[in-house]
Amino acid sequence: TDIENAEVYILGFYIDMTSAKLHEVLDMLKKGRQERSAEILRRLKALGMDIPLEYVLSLGKEGFTGRNQIFRAMVNLGFARPDKRYGDFQRYLGKKGLAYVEHRGLSPEDAVRFVRDSGGVPVLAHPGTDIPFSFIEDLIGIGLEGIEAYHPTHSKETTKKWLKFTKSRGLIVTGGSDFHNVSPEEPLGLGSLPVPDSIVLELTQRWLKISSVQSTPSC
């Protein structure tokens, strides 16, 4: 979801995939994404780019769609250049873009609570340089357990900053090479980003710790 100057993504590791609440929330998010995509497409059409919603939906998985699928459609139909990911994408679909529509999903706070309630480990994804420490401190107070310090968009300096921050706050570190980028010049995906093996062990240990606390009956 969005905050004043940045977009916030919460990852959920070890979520119970059979949870009825999970599927209820996913259905809500899917509907919200489709409504947002339809509004973005209306704005793009006003700019001379007529892109059918059905085509965009066909580029997503199981009905989920968003700006990355819209941008892929723009590229496929000749409305954007694939080598201008942060030019054309930001111009039309970025937070200050001509066709941008604010995302109305779970708030970061609700997302953290939801992941924990679903038996998972909530982690802040690729915070970059735009998310203020004070905001993250608030999420920690709610139950945030980690930060994705290793990410293709993070410079070495940014990664070091978040490694230091997580250590000082007792958080776990995670990493990901990402899978939803559509730019051919950015090699994202499995195996494209070195991440220490120890991260998996620490993540699993944190999940087991959370699970044991949640399963302990109160006196």
Where are these regions (language model features)?
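A metal-dependent hydrolase metal-coordination microenvironment
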Residues: T1-G66, I142, G146-P184, S192
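Active-site gating loops and adjacent loop-to-helix segments of metal-dependent hydrolytic enzymes
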Residues: T1-Q34, R72, N76-G97, G189-S211
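Active-site-proximal loop/helix segment associated with metal-binding centers of metalloenzymes
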Residues: E35-E54, L59-L106
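Conserved, well-ordered alpha-helix/loop/beta-strand core segments that scaffold catalytic motifs
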Residues: A99-I142
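Active-site-proximal helix-loop elements at catalytic-domain edges
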Residues: F133-E148, R206-P217
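Short, function-defining helix-loop hinge/capping sites that tune catalysis or transport
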Residues: S134, P184-E186
